[in-house]
Every structure is written in C-alpha cells, then in structure tokens.
C-alpha cells in the first residue's frame, strides 16, 4: 500500500495538468510506503500516448538512504489503468510501484509491477 499525502498529490496533479495534453512523468520519493515528495521529470517524447522519463540522475541515490522510488506518469484522456504501452515499458521499472494519474477523472491509482502483469 502507498500513502500519498495531499501536498504530494497536489504537486503531481499540477504537473499533469500543466503538461496535458501530453503525458507527464516523474518519481515519488517514499519512506515506509508514505510519499514524502514528488520529483518532476520531463517526458522526452512530449507525447499524449507515451513517455520517456528524463530526470536528474542524482535522485536515484536516495535509495541508498533507505527511500523507495515510485514511477509516476499521467494519462491525459484515459483511466489510470496501465495501457499496453505501459505494460511493454514496465520492464524498465521492475519491482517498483507504478503510479498513474487520470487527468480527466482526477484519479490516482497505484500498481505493482511484476514480470507477468500489473
């Protein structure tokens, strides 16, 4: 289970709305399953259907301090359910929590990535 405090969710929502109609992406820094902050990334593809996360590589070092990182992206027009494209790209993020925000529905959902499915 992942807990997203309102201030972190607000930052994620704001980023998604700013980037619409394209997908946005970033990382959520978690401690013991609770989100402490959202780190904006850049969608290198600038696409409404796909994303390629570009982010400061230094953020990955927070894992050395006991934090976890969850991968976040938005679906501007569709439900926050992993798409076929998301499933194809999931191998990049194996073992991480996958957060998807549906902009139109104002809904955030969390998924756990496995080799077989979400």
Model-derived features with residue positions:
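Conserved beta-strand-loop surface patch within small alpha/beta domains used
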Residues: 1-68, 77-118
